Curated annotation (Swiss-Prot):
A motif ('KMSKS' region) lies at residues 576-580. It comes from Bacillus cereus (strain G9842). The lineage of its organism: Bacteria, Bacillati, Bacillota, Bacilli, Bacillales. Belongs to the class-I aminoacyl-tRNA synthetase family. InterPro entries: aa-tRNA-synth_I_CS, aa-tRNA-synth_Ia, Leu-tRNA-ligase, Leu_tRNA-synth_edit, M/V/L/I-tRNA-synth_anticd-bd, Methionyl/Leucyl_tRNA_Synth, Rossmann-like_a/b/a_fold, tRNAsynth_Ia_anticodon-bd. The keyword Calcium does not apply. This is Leucine--tRNA ligase. A motif ('HIGH' region) lies at residues 40-51. It is found in: Cytoplasm.
């Protein structure tokens, strides 16, 4: 008889909730374990089967650690600000807050139905004013430290929608919603100076237990480069511009310069003859995103300004072009071009027939660019030097002549932190009529997002908050000075940068987190989530954590000690699950048909946790069949415990049991859940063959399967006669001595060829081995004379006979 998953799951979920079984203990004597999931955005679509994969992994670890005597922090919450709720509100006229609350309730119910051991008393919601009070508080600290500042930044402006769009909301230069044209225009934006932390963000990666591929993604994003800044005067004017180059040794090979179309000098230096062409090009570029502009494969475009720069090292005049592959927001917005020795410059020079000059020997620049090392030529005082020597000598020359200086730069840009949206955290700053600005006082936080019917974009580029006069307009009670609140809101990243800290102390109204509690719980021991957040979310969270470390709020330099990216669950056809393809599997349906334990077991058994694997109904059915086999082995049709279960030991199962405890314990700890489950299947096969089942082994097995299939685990535990939950029962321990093989397989050879294999005691003497071997190959050596018998104890017997 199989078990009734609906009854069992309902029963134990009710028990856990009523008894607050998974409440986090704050006592200090136990070792701690903090298992964190990337909290979900509560979308209208609800949970899909991809979510529970990571959640089940952290849940297995949390449940095992509790049984191993750890105090465990395993929380859940909601990353609930963001664009979809705002779009829904615009489309339906409902409030984004109501929509969000409804979605959170759906998500919470779905997650509870899967039996995860979360401490629901610690639930956080980024849209709760009691939560975002502290998001705003962190902003004030960034502002005080000079890490939050206002700047003019080119943004994606969509005139038809009257709003600024993120890069992700644009497809082929048009808005994703409605297909309206998008242009680049400068706007006043809040920026966070993440670049000030570039070196620390890079260096501290070495101390983390993260996948190397993920660390490399962060290293590349930060993109530290060493080189030099070089100053170029503009011929016939007092103006100059600066370029950064990693190859100052090739300065003698520069044949032209390129400025970003948005560069401040372009309008000033363009000649009358070139004005029309330059303006037309600038207007065309406004329609392109940074991503499109910097694609390596795209055809190079550009226009000559009519102006010339003077090469500081030899006085040569270099034509100044503008081209879209140079970004005003990246580096200095200007580059010196050495087409003989740089891939992009070579392509550009080839398109516009610009001169090339070889300054490093080793290639044939009439055929292709040469980027390797070699002796310098045509370079005056650098001639004959290799790359490293020439770079050092050129930097020395630049600094002595004040024509430049040594410089380290980062690919990392400061973080554009403002959004022209309603549904986000208000930025706690006031702009006064006299041009000054001040932060809202700490005691006035949270600055609550005002409720409004009108969340349509303002049309001016400001957020919809600009429409709410009674909220925006303020008067200083002391001076009578008039001011306007900041109308931009924070990006969705803000609330997710620090949520792992709030779980430690979710109801504290006096501080972001209690210093004693944070000391007790940090760093997070394991953080599991999708690889799509490998760069931005993790980089931003590490940045905020380091700022909080500098001001004494957190005791560790890094937030997440170990990180793991789960793979993706694909549709049965190996394609990504999506509504449009109609291949989305809803976990609610599986819980109803097969049970939560089956879903959990199946997702962990599909393959390695970091692999992307196709969903399979057959695999799901197989997982259910295994749980049914476990149930039938231990429980009779009448619901009583099987009569095979006895207090007496059973020698034949001893080794299999201890092997299973060892493998499951090690595999769970290393996140190899699929192989742990395989081992449990092997044990169940052995147990079916055994005459009797020692109660100790049955209890040990139930404890091992409970983290994967907790409802069945609890039900079997209660059938074994326990009134308490299995949650805090002690984890089984294996005996190393029981794993040692008593018997070994011996190979028997005649004249070096294998003729038989024998099983015998591992302690058999040479004489016993020889005797048993000769008996086994009697027919092979009949009529031959045995010349010699070579015995290797525990392994092999080789008979020489002719």
């Amino acid at each position: 008889m199989s078990f009734n998953h609906q009854d069992i799951e309902k029963k134990w979920q009710g028990y856990w909730e009523e008894n607050k079984t998974f409440r986090t203990p704050d006592e200090t004597e136990k070792p701690k374990f903090y298992a964190l999931d990337m909290f979900p955005y509560p979308s209208g679509a609800g949970l899909h089967v991809g979510h529970p994969e990571g959640y089940t992994a952290t849940d297995i670890l949390s449940r095992m650690k509790r049984m191993q005597g750890y105090k465990v922090l395993h929380p859940m919450g909601w990353d609930a600000f963001g664009l979809p709720a705002e779009q829904y509100a615009l489309d339906t006229g409902n409030s984004p807050a109501e929509f969000t609350e409804h979605n959170i309730n759906t998500f919470r119910n779905q997650i509870k139905s899967l039996g995860f051991s979360y401490d629901w008393d610690r639930e956080v919601n980024t849209t709760d004013p009691n939560y975002y009070k502290w998001t705003q508080w962190i902003f004030l600290k960034l502002f005080e430290k000079g890490l939050a500042y206002v700047d003019e930044v080119p943004v994606n402006w969509c005139p038809a929608l009257g709003t600024v769009l993120a890069n992700e909301e644009i497809i082929d230069g048009k808005s994703e919603r409605g297909g309206h044209p998008v242009e680049r225009r400068p706007m006043r934006q809040w920026m966070l100076k993440i670049t000030a932390y570039g070196d620390r963000l890079l260096e501290d990666l070495d101390e983390l237990d993260w996948p190397e591929s993920l660390k490399d993604m962060q290293r590349n994003w930060i993109g530290r480069s060493e080189g030099a800044e070089v100053h170029f005067n503009i011929d016939g004017t007092d103006e100059k511009f600066t370029v950064f180059t990693t190859r100052p040794d090739t300065l003698f090979g520069a044949t032209y310069c390129v400025l970003a179309p948005e560069h401040a000098l372009v309008a000033e230096i363009t000649t009358a003859e070139q004005k029309e062409a330059v303006e037309a090009y600038i207007n065309a570029v406004k329609m392109k995103s940074d991503l499109e502009r910097t694609e390596l494969a795209k055809e190079k475009t550009g226009v000559f300004t009519g102006a010339y720069a003077v090469n500081p090292v030899n006085g040569e005049k270099l034509p100044i072009w503008i081209a879209d592959y140079v970004l005003a927001t990246y580096g200095t917005g200007a580059v010196m071009a050495v087409p003989a020795h740089d891939e992009r410059d070579y392509e550009f020079a080839s398109v516009f027939n610009l001169p090339m000059k070889e300054v490093v020997k080793g290639g044939d620049i009439t055929k292709e660019v040469y980027t390797g090392d070699g002796a310098h030529v045509n370079s005056a005082f650098l001639d004959g030097l290799n790359k490293e020597e020439a770079i050092a000598k050129m930097i020395e020359w630049l600094e002595v002549t004040s024509a430049g200086n040594q410089k380290v730069t980062y690919r990392l840009r400061d973080w554009l932190f403002s959004r022209q949206r309603y549904w986000g955290e208000p930025i706690p700053v006031i702009h006064w009529e006299d041009g000054t600005m001040t932060a809202v006082k700490e005691e006035e936080l949270p600055l609550v997002l005002p409720k409004t019917e009108n969340i349509r974009p303002s049309g001016t580029g400001e957020s919809p908050l600009a429409n709410i006069d009674e909220w925006v307009n303020v008067v200083d009670p002391e001076t009578g000075k008039k001011g306007r609140r900041e109308t931009n809101t924070m990006p969705q990243w803000a609330g997710s940068c620090w949520y792992y800290l709030r779980y430690i102390d979710p109801n504290n109204s006096e501080a972001l987190v209690d210093p004693e509690k944070v000391k007790q719980w940090l760093p997070v021991d394991i953080y599991i989530g999708g690889a799509e957040h490998a760069v931005l979310h993790l980089l931003y969270a590490r940045f905020w954590h380091k700022v909080l470390y500098d001001i004494g709020v957190v005791p560790t330099k890094e937030p997440f000690q170990q990180l793991f990216n789960q793979g993706m669950i694909l549709g049965e056809n190996n394609e990504k699950m999506s509504k449009s393809k109609g291949n989305v599997v809803n976990p609610d349906d599986i819980v109803a048909s097969h049970g939560a334990d089956t879903l959990r077991l199946y997702e962990m058994f599909m393959g390695p946790l970091d692999a992307s694997i196709a969903w399979s109904e057959n695999g799901l059915d197989g997982a259910r069949r295994f749980l049914d086999r476990v149930w039938r082995l231990f429980v009779q049709d009448n619901g009583e415990l099987s009569e095979k279960i006895t207090d007496a030991p059973n020698k034949e199962l001893e080794k299999a049991y201890h092997q299973t405890v060892k493998k499951v314990t090690e595999d769970y700890a290393e996140l190899r859940f699929n192989t742990a489950i395989s081992q449990m299947m092997v044990f169940i096969n052995d147990a079916y063959k055994a005459e009797t089942l020692p109660k100790e082994y049955v209890e040990g097995f139930v404890k091992m399967i409970a983290p994967v299939a907790p409802h069945i685990g609890e039900e079997l535990w209660s059938k074994l006669g326990y009134n308490e939950t299995i949650t805090y029962a002690s984890w089984p321990i294996f005996d190393e001595s029981k794993l040692v093989e008593d018997e070994v397989e011996i190979v028997v050879q005649v004249m070096g060829k294998v003729r038989a294999k024998l099983t015998m005691s591992k302690d058999a003497s040479k004489e016993e081995m020889e005797q048993l071997a000769l008996e086994a190959i009697q027919d092979q050596i009949e009529g031959k004379t045995v010349r010699k018998v070579i015995v290797v104890p525990g392994k092999l017997v080789n008979v020489v006979a002719n």
